[in-house]
Amino acid sequence: MANILLLLHPTVVTDQHLVENVKADIRKSVGDAHVEQHIIDRVTRGEVELTRNTYDKIIYINPNVHNRSIPASLMKLVYETLIDEGEFSGDLPTDQALDVLMTGFIVSDTNDQCWIKPKPIESVSIPLRRKGKKTDASVSASSGTTALPLFKKLSSNSNNNNNSSSPIGLTDSSAANTDEETDEANVMKRKLDAAKLTYFSDSDSENEEDENDDIINEDDLIKDSNQLDLRSRLIIPKSCEIPNGKKRRKACKDCTCGLKEIEEQEEAQQRSLQDSILGKMAQSATLEAIKIEERLKRQPVKFKDEDLAEIDFTVEGKTGGCGSCALGDAFRCDGCPYLGMPPFKPGEIVSIDSLGEDL
């Protein structure tokens, strides 16, 4: 009985008949099968543990067309859960071919939405037979395959007869026309290649160390340049020099030596400093005004009966706050009841007709 796993995306709840339709298709195509279903988020977080090499087929159901990407960690988990030659199909992404191949899957030739876990290739062992037990002809005849060549060591007599100063080599007993010089040349070539590889790898490492020693941090150069005074680094041309050897304090009208830019920079720094000081002073004044206002609110002004008593300005010896009501409008306050009346003498009876109308 086949084991089938359904991985459901959380958006499956938008279509209540989608999962049932998939299960019906599985019953029609496979028949009797053991079907399990899990939410893919729970599998990714590790809340649901899946057994390795268990499922013959895993189907991913995702109705969200705009987001079908699968993390590489989930691909690896699905790969480990499938059996050999198992299939992972369904609503799979089509833009993650590299991740699919890196995980170990093979994309089906007939369907891009089907990934197959390949069966591992078994290694074939080739037995090596000892010298002297069987001849090459007997080995090839008995096994029906091409026999491996057998080698034997050259004797000292043959070396003396050949008067060769080369080291003792190996000869192939299965090949009659073996060229010993070719074998020695191949050995020397391999040794030479290995020596070249070692030399160049050592030289590359030394070059890397030298490059690291010669690297200068650019930030250090910037710090050093900032520590110097701008005026000390200024080069004044001959045309701007004063005859007595002194330097100009201000830049010329058409300055080209950089003194004008330095002055503008210093002026900008001074202006920013003044703005910051004025801003702090304004802020402190605002805070002080707020404190005074709060203090006045906590201590309201109260008038006594003496302050609220009415004063008769017609009686001699009694005056108002200004004491000039009898002199005329030019000497009267804004709220004086005698505004608009001619001047009068202290003690003179004054009638105010406008008050009667108001009453």
UniProtKB/Swiss-Prot annotation:
Gene Ontology biological process terms, A to Z: cellular response to oxidative stress; iron-sulfur cluster assembly; negative regulation of hydrogen peroxide-mediated programmed cell death; negative regulation of nitric oxide biosynthetic process
A GO MF label: 2 iron, 2 sulfur cluster binding
Composition-biased stretches (Polar residues): 167-177
Keywords: 2Fe-2S, 4Fe-4S, Cytoplasm, Iron, Iron-sulfur, Metal-binding, Mitochondrion
Locus of motif Cx2C motif 1: 322-325
Top-rank taxon: Eukaryota
GO CC entries: cytosolic [4Fe-4S] assembly targeting complex; mitochondrial intermembrane space
Span list, region Disordered: 152-187
A Pfam family reported for this protein in Swiss-Prot or TrEMBL: DRE2_N
Positions with a binding annotation for [4Fe-4S] cluster: C322, C325, C333, C336
InterPro entries: Anamorsin (IPR007785), CIAPIN1 (IPR046408), Dre2_N (IPR031838)
Region (Fe-S binding site A): 240-257
Binding-site residues, [2Fe-2S] cluster: C240, C252, C255, C257
Compositional bias annotation for Low complexity: 155-166
Region of interest (Linker), ranges: 159-228
UniProt short sequence motif Cx2C motif 2, positions renumbered to this chain: 333-336
Compartments (UniProt record): Cytoplasm; Mitochondrion intermembrane space
Region (Fe-S binding site B): 322-336
Quaternary structure annotation from Swiss-Prot or TrEMBL: Monomer. Interacts with TAH18. Interacts with MIA40.
This protein's domain notes: The C-terminal domain binds 2 Fe-S clusters but is otherwise mostly in an intrinsically disordered conformation. The N-terminal domain has structural similarity with S-adenosyl-L-methionine-dependent methyltransferases, but does not bind S-adenosyl-L-methionine. It is required for correct assembly of the 2 Fe-S clusters.
Stated role: Component of the cytosolic iron-sulfur (Fe-S) protein assembly (CIA) machinery required for the maturation of extramitochondrial Fe-S proteins. Part of an electron transfer chain functioning in an early step of cytosolic Fe-S biogenesis, facilitating the de novo assembly of a [4Fe-4S] cluster on the scaffold complex CFD1-NBP35. Electrons are transferred to DRE2 from NADPH via the FAD- and FMN-containing protein TAH18.
Name recorded for this polypeptide: Fe-S cluster assembly protein DRE2
Taxonomic source organism: Scheffersomyces stipitis (strain ATCC 58785 / CBS 6054 / NBRC 10063 / NRRL Y-11545)
Gene from which the chain derives: DRE2
